[in-house]
């Protein structure tokens, strides 16, 4: 195995373990609420989770921007800037999370107005929301920490944090639901406790592993106007890109919710397959962004191009593996998540769409990582603009006639267009560099 392949795996494998715990966390929550005795419990957690995904996705630049800029600064050996980037990211995360807590009531009103859940789902989703909102400071702070760790080529610490979070979440959720008889509230409290545990452990690991970096701390340079302008200019396109991403995901869930609790539950279960693949692929994307940013910062374009090729090769093998697994065992996997027979039966009809996701989304997932490392955020934004336009065009024209099948078609086309646009942009930025 080539040295660069080993470097990719050293970053990717801990990231895969770390990232796969995210959909596993959702799967555990779905498995718990899926056995509570009604599809409306699944729908409530689905709607509540989607709202928080939207909130956190909007501020995903705290991870992505920090990772790209940190890896480039590391490649330049600008260690004082590496430290300043961490402080900037955590400070911005704190300010944003405080704003979210202060505005939680209008945020809830707006989010649930846009999602339009059924009257059966709404009260349970509201309970979930007003508990989970208190995990926002921990989640956004952990975004900043994780991005910095990835930029430092260290994915082992995020892996440890994610595993610990899931152990805490599973233990707390099971304790509160099965021992204390709580329903959606128990799942929500378990999530918040796990989020804060993860952030606090992340700070402890930062002090333990990077205390020597403190000597590069230079307070006067942290909040210089030029530094903050660059920080936000790099993240501006990521922010706008994320709004497009949120709009697509929000509409997908909302369109499913408007078709009833069963279809919403079906789409939620199938999306777990989508998320499972995406988080595994993000492991290689993280390797791409960390290494691409480092080589780009060092001006080593030969190593950069070789890294891109090798990351795509590993990603292709993973896409093939997931396609085979979903074809052979997708139905059995869904049956493990719920004992609601109406949901299980309906899921079989739409499973083929989930099978298409691995190869349809391969290019989009890998290029996202590479472009984050290069901080080529404008291309990332344009890929989401074009793909979102394609998604909504299909939804508005075909969903009224073909229902949920058209909704899934729109999602598949959406990820394909993302990959195509980024491939064209990469040809201009990387191959001609």
Q: What kind of region is each of these model predictions?
A:
Residues 10-29, 131, 142, 151, ...:
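Transmembrane helical elements of multi-pass membrane transporters/channels
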Residues 27-31, 144-148, 170-175, 203, ...:
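Alpha-helical transmembrane segments of multipass membrane proteins
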Residues 1-15, 70-137, 179-239, 292-357, ...:
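Short alpha-helical transmembrane segments in multi-pass integral membrane proteins
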Residues 6, 21-22, 59, 100, ...:
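Alpha-helical transmembrane segments of multi-pass membrane transport proteins
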Residues 24-43, 112-119, 175-182, 239, ...:
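Helix-terminus/linker motif at the lipid-water interface of multi-pass membrane proteins
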Residues 42-102, 139-157, 266-328, 362-375, ...:
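Small-residue-rich hydrophobic transmembrane alpha-helices
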Residues 5-7, 11-12, 22, 41, ...:
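Hydrophobic alpha-helical transmembrane segments of integral membrane proteins
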């Amino acid at each position: 195995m080539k040295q660069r392949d080993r470097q990719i795996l050293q970053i990717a494998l801990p990231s895969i373990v770390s990232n796969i715990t995210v959909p596993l966390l959702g799967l555990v929550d779905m498995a718990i609420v899926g056995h509570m005795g009604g599809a409306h419990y699944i729908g409530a957690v689905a709607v509540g989770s989607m709202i928080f995904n939207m909130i956190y996705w909007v501020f995903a630049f705290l991870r992505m921007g920090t990772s790209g800029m940190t890896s480039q600064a590391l490649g330049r050996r600008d260690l004082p800037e590496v430290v300043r980037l961490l402080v900037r990211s955590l400070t911005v995360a704190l300010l944003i999370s405080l704003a979210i807590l202060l505005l939680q009531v209008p945020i809830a009103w707006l989010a649930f107005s846009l999602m339009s859940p059924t009257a059966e789902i709404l009260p349970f989703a509201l309970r979930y929301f007003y508990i989970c909102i208190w995990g926002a400071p921990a989640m956004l702070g952990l975004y900043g920490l994780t991005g910095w760790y990835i930029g430092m080529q260290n994915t082992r610490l995020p892996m440890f944090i994610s595993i610990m979070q899931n152990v805490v979440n599973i233990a707390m959720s099971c304790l509160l639901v099965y021992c204390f008889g709580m329903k959606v509230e128990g799942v929500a409290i378990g999530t918040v406790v796990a989020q804060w545990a993860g952030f606090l452990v992340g700070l402890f690991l930062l002090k333990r592993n990077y205390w020597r970096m403190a000597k590069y701390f230079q307070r006067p340079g942290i909040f210089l106007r030029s530094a903050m302008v660059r920080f936000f200019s790099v993240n501006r396109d990521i922010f706008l890109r994320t709004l497009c991403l949120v709009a697509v995901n929000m509409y997908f869930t909302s369109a499913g919710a408007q078709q009833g609790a069963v279809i919403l539950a079906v789409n939620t279960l199938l999306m777990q397959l989508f998320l499972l693949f995406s988080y595994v692929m993000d492991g290689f994307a993280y390797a791409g962004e960390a290494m691409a940013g480092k080589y780009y910062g060092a001006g080593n374009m030969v190593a950069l191009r070789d890294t891109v090729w090798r990351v795509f090769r590993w990603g292709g093998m993973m896409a093939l593996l997931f396609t085979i697994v979903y074809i052979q065992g997708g139905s059995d996997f869904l049956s493990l998540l719920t004992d609601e027979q109406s949901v299980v039966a309906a899921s079989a009809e739409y499973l083929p769409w989930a099978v298409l996701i691995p190869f349809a989304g391969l290019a989009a997932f890998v290029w996202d990582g590479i472009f984050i490392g290069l901080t080529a955020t404008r291309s990332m934004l344009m890929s989401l603009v074009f793909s979102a336009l394609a998604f909504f065009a299909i939804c508005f024209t075909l969903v009224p006639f073909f229902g949920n099948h058209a909704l899934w078609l729109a999602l598949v086309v959406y990820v394909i267009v993302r990959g195509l646009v980024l491939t064209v942009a990469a040809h201009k930025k990387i191959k001609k560099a």
